[in-house]
Regions:
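RNase H catalytic domain
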Residues: 14-21, 57-140, 144, 149
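RNase H-like nuclease fold core
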Residues: 1-53, 57, 61-70, 85, ...
Length: 163
């Protein structure tokens, strides 16, 4: 049995205003069997979105960039994303038909569902890191996310619904 390649995906999301212009940053890191380190950075900015949507988009973009099944460690400063999986919020939402415990529709259900699709070919675990505390990759992802949010060519977040 062949072991899955291991990829670390570091992510961060940002929004100016919440809602406001936003962006995500993502670093994919893979050490190949010869010991060569491969790294790729991804980012994009959106006209009107929220920080939580951008946190989700960072993970989605990283997973969707992978070309074959991998063991993936997602490293994020977003408790929203990490706790949703590690504390099984997502499983509960699915059982309740994408409703919260208080029977409200789950926010960002479109992106949660897209994230679940992106996870399917992979074995994924989620790890939380404290943001803005000198974690090199988290700081880089934050810089990518804020630069994307401040960029000139912002995309439309078609799933964003103002409250």
């Amino acid at each position: 049995m062949q072991l899955l390649p291991h990829v670390d995906i570091f992510t961060d999301g940002s929004s100016r205003g919440n809602p406001g212009p936003g962006g995500y940053g993502c670093i994919l890191r893979y050490l190949d069997p010869t010991g060569l380190l491969h790294e790729r950075e991804l980012s994009a900015g959106y006209r009107l979105t929220t920080n939580n949507r951008m946190e989700l988009m960072g993970v989605i973009a990283g997973l969707e960039a992978l070309r074959k099944p991998c063991h993936v460690s997602v490293i994020s400063d977003s408790q929203y994303v990490v706790k949703a999986f590690n504390e099984e919020w997502v499983s509960a939402w699915i059982k309740r038909g994408w409703k919260t415990a208080s029977k409200e529709p789950v926010k960002n259900a479109d992106l949660w569902q897209r994230l679940l699709q992106a996870m399917k070919p992979h074995k994924v675990d989620f790890r939380w890191v404290r943001g803005h505390m000198g974690h090199e990759e988290n700081e880089r992802c934050d810089a990518l996310a804020t630069a994307a949010a401040d960029g000139l060519e912002l995309l439309e977040d078609t799933g964003f619904v103002p409250e």
